């Protein structure tokens, strides 16, 4: 949909600004416009024209300030990787592999490694999203398998979400850091293992929300 296209376009621009366009005089807003048009053309759904017009303007505001914000927030850094691919074996699960892509990995002057995941959103994240352990577990697992891949000490790696806010008037770009210590890592790995075993054993958990009108059940509130 439009939201996915918007997020993909911004991700691409942020990646390109730190790789092929680094230290070049480029128009970030124009880069976004080009990428967003590409993504829109791929959509095989009816588009809301008013939303598309708004997204063009919103993206053109976000694109020029994202990388400068990261540079201000983290200080001088070098890019370790963009779109870092993880394809690592999950211990004790019979050869199953963890697959993921980290948006951005940087190394700061204090020799810390920072794993960053871009999240496009409307006005930002509320308290519930910021405290949601399931959201945080994404980065926790990224860190665990990244450290395993490169044999890096976990204490040398920090994790962050970079919020790119479409409709916010202020703080349009924000870095939100998450904890990823030993206890949280252990909990995330255990939850992942449980999920894999559940799927492997073909155990299907009933979705009780499917019994509501929101899911279009034809028998909702019938005898």
Q: What would you call each of these model-derived segments?
A:
Residues 1-223:
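RecB-family 4Fe-4S metal-dependent nuclease core
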């Amino acid at each position: 949909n439009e939201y996915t296209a918007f997020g993909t376009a911004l991700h691409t621009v942020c990646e390109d600004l730190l790789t092929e366009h680094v230290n070049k005089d480029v128009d970030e807003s124009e880069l976004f416009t080009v990428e967003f048009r590409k993504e829109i053309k791929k959509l095989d759904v009816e588009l809301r024209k008013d939303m598309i017009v708004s997204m063009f303007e919103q993206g053109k505001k976000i694109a020029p300030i994202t990388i400068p914000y990261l540079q201000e927030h983290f200080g001088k850094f070098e890019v370790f990787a963009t779109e870092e691919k993880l394809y690592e074996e999950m211990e004790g699960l019979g050869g199953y592999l963890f697959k993921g892509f980290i948006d951005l990995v940087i190394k700061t002057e204090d020799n810390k490694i920072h794993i960053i995941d871009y999240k496009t959103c409307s006005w930002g994240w509320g308290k519930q999203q910021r405290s949601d352990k399931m959201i945080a577990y994404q980065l926790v697992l990224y860190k665990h398998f990244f450290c395993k891949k490169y044999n890096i000490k976990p204490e040398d790696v920090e994790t962050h979400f970079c919020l790119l806010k479409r409709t916010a008037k202020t703080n349009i770009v924000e870095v939100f850091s998450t904890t990823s210590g030993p206890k949280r890592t252990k909990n995330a790995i255990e939850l992942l293992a449980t999920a894999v075993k559940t799927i492997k054993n073909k155990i299907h958990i009933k979705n009780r929300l499917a019994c509501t009108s929101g899911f279009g059940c034809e028998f909702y509130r019938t005898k």
